[in-house]
């Protein structure tokens, strides 16, 4: 028997050395975190930055290698005792999850120029979108401009703001049922749409759908995606089913 016998297995901290290493891209919120976020009994109930070892920000929050919390933007948010316990316990789903946080120790959402913070800020944002306003929302990798994708007037206003007269906008739908209501979706397309990458998928529009025509003028197709960040899911709670989603960039 040539099998080596070992007496110990240790998980040690990273060392800062030169070399090539794979850093995971950001991963859309997993089903387990989604379930926790909407569980009133969970301590991360409605937490807009919930994550675990299976999902959440990775490359976007990294400042330097190796990938450890003190070299990410989360270094500004020390873990509370409960999060620290999960982080150091290899039996938990958040063992060694660098961005781990909760409502007590993690970042909080806020509105620029308004007093609302936390859940109140999300509630007010929902109200603005329902009222036909355009909102800049900071997600995992930057800002996006959002509005009600069924409101023709506000979508046209967004086109004027972006100086984009005809280029199609992407649409974020609340869930798969909304996508199927607005577009023709094959099983293969649904599998891609609901995967952990949450890509923008080009789909055929239904003639009886409710999207504003200005979302993709004179185009039988529309780019659709599902929410990938917790804050997006929270904004969709008790809200309209679709929003027009565009990067906050100036056209070249």
Question: What is the meaning of each model-derived region?
Answer:
Residues 129-143, 147:
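Glycine-rich N-terminal segment of FAD-binding domains in flavoprotein oxidoreductases
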Residues 142-205:
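A phosphate-binding glycine/aspartate-rich beta-alpha loop in the early core of alpha/beta enzymes
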Residues 82-87, 98-99, 104-110, 121-122, ...:
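Non-transmembrane, aqueous-exposed alpha-helical and coiled segments at domain scale
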Residues 7-8, 43, 60-66, 146-151, ...:
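Short acidic, glycine/serine/threonine-rich loops at helix termini
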Residues 3-25, 180-184, 190-194, 202, ...:
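His/Asp/Glu-rich metal-coordinating catalytic cores
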Residues 246-252:
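Conserved small/polar residues in nucleotide/adenosyl-binding loops
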Residues 1-103, 107-110:
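Intrinsically disordered, low-complexity, mixed-charge
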Residues 52, 102, 139, 158, ...:
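Residue-level signal for inorganic ion chemistry
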